[in-house]
């Protein structure tokens, strides 16, 4: 595939990958036998070396690797996929080191479950949608994360909840928090596909790297309503608001995200211009949906927390909105643990 183009400017692509040889003690002056295309030799169910029709063809080598990866006898592929999906829903994988299933990685907490899920996924069409459905409808996933008196014995035996006797309480990802605020305002753009959107101001710099300023971006621009997955990521200059919520930078490999609770997060969720503008937009929507403060409070909790307020909450929130304004009430709701955390 790399050789199928017209030479331009005198460039002549090589006919295939150059030969690679094992070096004695890593010394380039002492080459030993040539290495042929292959994969891991520790998997007894699959051949360690690829049988390619043309050893020198780069495309044939890649095709052989692809066939090796999706082979039904390859245990690593299916285990790795289901482990990462499990990690997405529970906060940590059955194997806590998703990038390392080897000797230096963590031991699986539920090896039989990992194998069962891997085989089920492999033999049922490899549908990620069906795998998500299977997990979220399980009794394990539907457990509460609240501590109960009956769980005191389990708390003593497994304080870190490795064996999932309750659900883990987790904070929403940075992208989910941003999208949840947009959803509450009614401005979330659900269009799928298309190019990413640059949600920052970009001006030429004195050198190669341009000047990026997130604070000068127009938060009323339609581009700011796209879902977070369509944000343009500038790898070396991440969005400070998203970074404060543990959104990883684009220039690092992050198999497991940090999940912290810090003062900086509280300050960002209360003072950032993005939160302030979304609070104003949310208040505008509430005024259009409710004729008085009581109705607006009722709708506000339905849109942010998915429930109706209690009588005590209703009285307190109405008094707060009357004294400090509906915009500040919306900002308070965006900062509630019930909005930011998943129980």
Named regions from a protein language model:
Residues 260-263:
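Terminal end segments
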Residues 1-223, 248, 252-257, 273-327, ...:
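Primarily short, surface-exposed interaction patches in extracytoplasmic proteins
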Residues 229-230, 244-248:
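C-terminal, charged and often intrinsically disordered regions of DNA end-processing helicases
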Residues 237-245:
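Active-site Gly/Thr loop motif
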Residues 339:
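Terminal recognition/anchoring or ligand-binding modules at protein termini
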């Amino acid at each position: 595939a790399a050789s199928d183009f017209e030479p331009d400017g005198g460039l002549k692509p090589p006919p295939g990958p150059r030969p690679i040889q094992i070096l004695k003690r890593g010394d380039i002056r002492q080459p030993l036998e040539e290495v042929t295309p292959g994969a891991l030799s520790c998997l007894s169910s699959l051949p360690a070396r690829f049988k390619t029709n043309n050893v020198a063809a780069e495309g044939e080598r890649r095709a052989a690797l692809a066939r090796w990866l999706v082979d039904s006898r390859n245990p690593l592929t299916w285990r790795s996929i289901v482990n990462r999906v499990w990690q997405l829903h529970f906060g940590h994988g059955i194997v806590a080191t998703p990038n390392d299933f080897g000797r230096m990685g963590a031991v699986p907490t539920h090896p039989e479950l990992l194998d069962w899920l891997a085989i089920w996924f492999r033999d049922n069409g490899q549908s990620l949608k069906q795998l998500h459905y299977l997990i979220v409808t399980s009794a394990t996933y539907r457990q509460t994360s609240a501590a109960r008196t009956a769980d005191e014995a389990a708390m003593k035996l497994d304080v870190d909840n490795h064996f999932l006797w309750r659900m883990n309480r987790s904070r929403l990802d940075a992208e989910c928090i941003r999208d949840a605020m947009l959803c509450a305002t009614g401005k979330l753009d659900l269009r799928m596909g298309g190019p990413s959107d640059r949600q920052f101001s970009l001006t030429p710099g004195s050198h190669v790297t341009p000047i990026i300023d997130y604070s000068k971006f127009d938060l009323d621009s339609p581009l700011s309503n796209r879902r977070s997955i369509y944000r343009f990521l500038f790898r070396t200059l991440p969005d400070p608001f998203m970074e404060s919520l543990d959104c990883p930078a684009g220039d690092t490999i992050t198999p497991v995200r940090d999940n912290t609770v810090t003062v900086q997060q509280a300050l960002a969720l209360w003072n950032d211009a993005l939160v302030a503008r979304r609070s104003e937009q949310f208040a505008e929507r509430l005024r259009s949906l409710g004729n008085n403060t009581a109705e607006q409070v009722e709708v506000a909790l339905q849109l942010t927390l998915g429930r109706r307020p209690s009588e005590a909450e209703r009285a307190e929130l109405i008094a707060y909105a009357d004294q400090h304004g509906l915009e500040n009430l919306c900002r308070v709701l965006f900062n509630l643990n019930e909005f930011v955390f998943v129980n």
